[in-house]
Design a protein with these regions (language model features):
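Compact alpha/beta protein-protein interaction domains typified by the UBC
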Residues: 1-133
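Domain-scale recognition of soluble eukaryotic interaction modules
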Residues: 106-207
Length: 207
């Protein structure tokens, strides 16, 4: 209160993207409708982003035989925590994070260690059959579309992972079962936070 006994409005501060989402969650819980998935971490009129915790998933490779021993290989391997983002322009991004905690706007991002992903994190979709819409109800379909596709070649030709022998050697060892738990030390720091990436939608969109 001020000296006259009236209320005083203090200086405010801009809301972060995550603060907006928390407010939206609070308001939507008071209304009838569908549930908000726990893995949804951001949504506005231009994009939606969600988190996939670290865990075991099958991955598929179709590469030259001299790179992964066989032309086609598929194994269940460990994966790091991931954040996916799809924009209304259907630009699709993926970034890696360390640990198993739900990401916040201050969470540091790392390069997703996968083939067919550009430096910005944008996924090269090729002929992947994508869901028609990017909505909260479709998150599992988008995640499955990523992991059920063939990984064919690195779009980042150096520094995809920090691993002796490079990306092909890394994934050959992963497929051979040499790392039961995903080796987070191999992830390349992108020197940016999740909040920064979501504000810029990946900084640039690769064609």
């Amino acid at each position: 209160a001020n000296q006259g006994g009236g209320a005083t409005i203090l200086p405010g501060r801009p809301m972060t993207a995550f603060a907006v989402l928390r407010l939206a969650r609070s308001l939507m819980k008071r209304q009838d409708g569908g549930f908000i998935p726990d893995r949804l971490i951001f949504q506005d009129s231009a994009a939606i982003a969600w988190w996939v915790p670290p865990g075991m998933r099958r991955i598929w490779f179709r590469c030259p035989e001299d790179q992964l021993v066989a032309g086609e290989r598929s194994e269940v391997v460990s994966h790091p925590g991931l954040v996916f983002c799809v924009t209304t322009a259907r630009k699709w991004f993926v970034w890696a994070i360390k640990g198993a905690a739900r990401p916040k706007d201050s969470t540091r991002l790392f390069r997703a260690p996968y083939f067919n992903v550009w430096e910005s994190g944008q996924i090269c979709v090729g002929n992947v059959d994508l869901p028609e819409r990017a909505t909260a109800e479709k998150l599992d379909e988008w995640t499955s579309a990523f992991f059920d596709s063939w990984f064919t070649h690195p779009n980042v030709h150096s520094n995809l992972v920090r691993y002796r022998g490079g990306a092909y050697r890394f994934w050959r060892d992963m497929l051979d079962g040499k790392h039961v738990v995903f080796p987070e030390r191999t992830l390349v720091d992108l020197d940016r936070t999740l909040g920064e990436a979501l504000q810029s939608r990946g900084a640039k969109h690769d064609n």
